[in-house]
């Protein structure tokens, strides 16, 4: 997703502390300050007009005095769990049900928060973006007011990075 923002020439807020690795060869595009958003969200005021990556559990801590347009990327839970297991390098079978309920709760809580606070958002299903990029990208382009040609955005989607694919 962040590669799409980069291609669309969005101003991405990142500190490049977490660099690309074998799990994410295109990089993470993260901002260290986001990890502390629960205690301090003041940094968001300095990021007006920028694109920032915030994981679902932390969305509910954003500064409500600011305006947002949220692109909510939803990944298949089994694929998330498989990816986490590979990144951590250990079998997570015992913890998977716990993670499953926590993940589901965070996603739903984030949706409710966005709706309750009238924050404009679009949900993009990770699998759909890969399987039907034209439709997803057109929706994303409309939502973000991107003028980047569809084909240019489509060229960014790298199927080889979809390594933790659940069978349909």
Task: Kindly give the residue locations of the regions a language model identified.
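Short, surface-exposed acidic
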Residues: 13-17, 145-156
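PAPS-dependent sulfotransferase catalytic domain
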Residues: 51-149
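PAPS-dependent sulfotransferase catalytic core
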Residues: 1-50, 158-168
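Generic secondary-structure boundary/loop-capping signal
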Residues: 25-26, 78, 126-127, 154, ...
């Amino acid at each position: 997703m962040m590669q799409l923002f980069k291609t669309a020439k969005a101003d991405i807020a990142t500190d490049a502390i977490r660099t690309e690795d074998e799990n994410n060869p295109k990089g993470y595009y993260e901002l260290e300050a986001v990890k502390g958003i629960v205690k301090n969200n003041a940094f968001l005021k300095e990021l007006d007009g920028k694109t920032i990556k915030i994981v679902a559990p932390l969305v509910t801590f954003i500064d409500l005095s600011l305006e947002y347009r949220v692109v909510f990327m939803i990944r298949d839970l089994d694929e998330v769990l498989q990816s986490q297991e590979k990144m951590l390098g250990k079998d997570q079978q015992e913890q998977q049900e716990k993670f499953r309920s926590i993940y589901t709760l965070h996603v739903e809580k984030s949706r409710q928060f966005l709706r309750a606070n009238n924050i404009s958002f679009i949900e993009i299903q990770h699998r759909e973006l890969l399987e039907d990029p034209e439709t997803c990208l057109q929706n994303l382009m409309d939502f973000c007011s991107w003028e980047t040609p569809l084909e240019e955005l489509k060229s960014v989607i790298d199927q080889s990075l979809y390594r933790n694919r659940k069978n349909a």
